[in-house]
């Protein structure tokens, strides 16, 4: 049986529209989970792994408040990319994005939907992100390309927290474009020379505990 070219065109057009709608629906589910958490405070243990410099494990306090206030408070130094520390950014799950459904993929024993997200805000630092989202709308993996901080990726582990907050996040990032806190005393010129001949990828593992959620966190915490 011969198929009419117009029929094939309409079929693929419909399929494309369905995939687009499905991607938006999945992001909407993530957004709904996200909006349940108005604020939180948590304890964090940060382990940074960089080939050419030894960095001790740090303890930190983490503060978050909607829509985009985020603070790591740690004594001394904790090397993290600015975007990597605040992965649930509004830039990725608000309505001002183009979302494209790619495929299904299994991470561990979790079936996820892979979505590419392009922020439409010209001022967004994020150019393109790929999200691996489970059927209960938790992000298990993220890869982002940014204008100013290179490329970073993150993998999330969860326990049974009622607000679907992660127990651990493992972030891989470009060491030369990471956020360096004020007061960091390492010789950056020497560090940059070493990084030119070695792997410039760093890894940070952040373990969270002691979440306090929706306590009415003051804006003063972020000043």
Predicted regions and their residues:
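N-terminal secretory signal peptides that target proteins for export/translocation
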Residues: 1-2
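Sec-dependent N-terminal signal peptides
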Residues: 5-14
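N-terminal leader/targeting segments and the immediate start of mature chains
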Residues: 15-45, 49-51
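A short, amphipathic edge element
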Residues: 23-25, 91-101, 149-150, 202-206
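Edge/loop elements at the starts and ends of beta-strands within beta-rich repeat scaffolds
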Residues: 33-40, 53, 108-110, 135, ...
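One face of beta-strands
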Residues: 40-46, 60-62, 68-76, 129, ...
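An acidic-aromatic
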Residues: 49-108
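Gly/Pro-enriched, hydrophobic low-complexity segments
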Residues: 111-220
């Amino acid at each position: 049986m011969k198929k009419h070219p117009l029929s094939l065109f309409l079929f693929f057009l419909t399929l494309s529209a369905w995939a687009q709608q499905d991607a938006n629906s999945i992001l909407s589910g993530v957004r709904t989970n996200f909006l349940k958490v108005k604020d939180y405070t948590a304890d964090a243990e940060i382990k940074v792994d960089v080939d050419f410099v030894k960095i001790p494990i740090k303890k930190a306090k983490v503060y978050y408040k909607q829509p985009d206030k985020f603070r790591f408070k740690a004594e001394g130094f904790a090397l993290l990319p600015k975007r990597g520390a605040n992965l649930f950014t509004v830039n990725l799950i608000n309505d001002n994005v183009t979302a494209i459904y790619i495929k299904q993929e299994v991470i561990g024993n979790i079936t996820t939907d892979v979505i590419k997200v392009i922020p439409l805000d010209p001022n967004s630092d994020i150019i393109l992100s790929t999200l691996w989202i489970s059927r209960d709308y938790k992000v298990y993996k993220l890869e982002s390309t940014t204008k100013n901080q290179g490329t970073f990726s993150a993998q999330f582990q969860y326990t049974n927290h009622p607000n679907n907050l992660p127990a651990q996040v493992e972030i891989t990032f470009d060491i030369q474009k990471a956020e360096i806190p004020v007061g960091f005393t390492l010789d950056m010129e020497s560090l940059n020379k070493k990084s030119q001949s070695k792997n410039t990828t760093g890894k940070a593992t952040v373990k969270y505990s002691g979440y306090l959620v929706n306590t009415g966190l003051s804006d003063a915490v972020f000043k």
